[in-house]
Amino acid sequence: MSLNAEQTASILAEFGRCENDTGSTEVQVALLTAQINHLQGHFKEHKHDHHSRRGLLRMVNTRRKLLAYLKRTENVRYQELIKKLGLRR
């Protein structure tokens, strides 16, 4: 239920500041968003998978906290990121 290596590499190339950037806030939020979108499709088929649903809620909360941090520290990068990812904020 995780992303494969090609998907991860494409996200790193699109959102990373350099080629080995895996820890910046933008990359972390983009990876979490891709995993959340993947799990949403999983739950359409497996409605009673409560164990994975708990993991999904943890990912959503982590993404929310990272976005709040980015908005508080660098609002311009925050606005660009949510526009690229198509988030509702």
From Swiss-Prot:
Keyword RNA-binding (UniProt): yes
Swiss-Prot/TrEMBL GO biological process terms: translation
Superkingdom: Bacteria
Alphabetical list of SMART domains matching this protein: Ribosomal_S15
TM spans (from-to): none
Pfam hit, one: Ribosomal_S15
Keywords, sorted A to Z: Ribonucleoprotein, Ribosomal protein, RNA-binding, rRNA-binding
Database matches in SUPFAM superfamilies: S15/NS1 RNA-binding domain (SSF47060)
Record's function text: One of the primary rRNA binding proteins, it binds directly to 16S rRNA where it helps nucleate assembly of the platform of the 30S subunit by binding and bridging several RNA helices of the 16S rRNA. Forms an intersubunit bridge (bridge B4) with the 23S rRNA of the 50S subunit in the ribosome.
Subunit composition and interactions: Part of the 30S ribosomal subunit. Forms a bridge to the 50S subunit in the 70S ribosome, contacting the 23S rRNA.
Name of the featured protein: Small ribosomal subunit protein uS15
Provenance organism: Shewanella woodyi (strain ATCC 51908 / MS32)
